[in-house]
Amino acid sequence: KRVNKSWRQDLRFFCGGRLIFGPDVRSVFVILLLIIGPVAVFCIFVGKHLCKDYSNGLAMVVVVVIHTFIVLVLLLRTSGRDPGIIPRNAHPPEPEEDVNLPSNWSGSVTPKLKLPRTKDILVNGVTVKIKYCDTCMLYRPPRCSHCSICNNCVERFDHHCPWVGQCIGRRNYPFFFMFILSTTLLCFLVFVLCVLRVKKLMEENSPHTVWKALERTPASTFLMAYVFLATWFVGGLTVFHTYLIGTNQVS
């Protein structure tokens, strides 16, 4: 019996449970469009000119395509992987032995014991306070949190990412970081190659202003503006998570 049978069915399972997506899996298709669409525009309207203008132009386009493929694989590994879901209990845990019975207990009816909201455990010689989750009926390990969207407790929970439609936790955080890092590099690569295309147009009709060159290649103009804005978002996210990794924190 698979462990995922005990998980909330708000999740989406594919390939016999090998792929696990969050309830907002549709947002993944939006991300796919935002990645594949601009790359397709680049290959069709900019890449063909790079192949003509530069001896290694074809290699430039191939690098972009391969890098895009890597980004998509990392996206799938981030969005379709178990982030570290802790299977919920079917029943509340047994109360500790030192839980006191009510003073007015007659003995004829078993009292309803209320579990403490927190308890202390020892981790590497340090006392850590852990909390009880009423939904999953378990005491959450350190750095574990309950996601209100997926409705599961996730180990080393960082955040629920609406863009990839999945929680980011212990098991998929490395893929998430590599995804945003590789996406940042892809944006930078496309921007530089579009600049090369504009530069070539300026050289062909010298003296040619930048604005005239941009008018002659609207695809490059669009892509440079698009990846510039995208880099502010995903690049800033990459820098932020690099800092978190360096300081051993979660967001």
Task: Identify what each model region corresponds to.
Residues 1-113, 168-251:
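Hydrophobic alpha-helical transmembrane segments that serve as membrane anchors
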Residues 127-130, 141, 155:
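Processing junctions and N-termini across compartments
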Residues 62-63, 118-121, 134, 148, ...:
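Eukaryotic intrinsically disordered and solvent-exposed regulatory patches
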Residues 137, 151-154, 165-168:
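Cys/His-coordinated zinc-binding microdomains
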Residues 133-136, 147-150, 161:
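Short cysteine-rich clusters marking metal-coordination/redox-active sites
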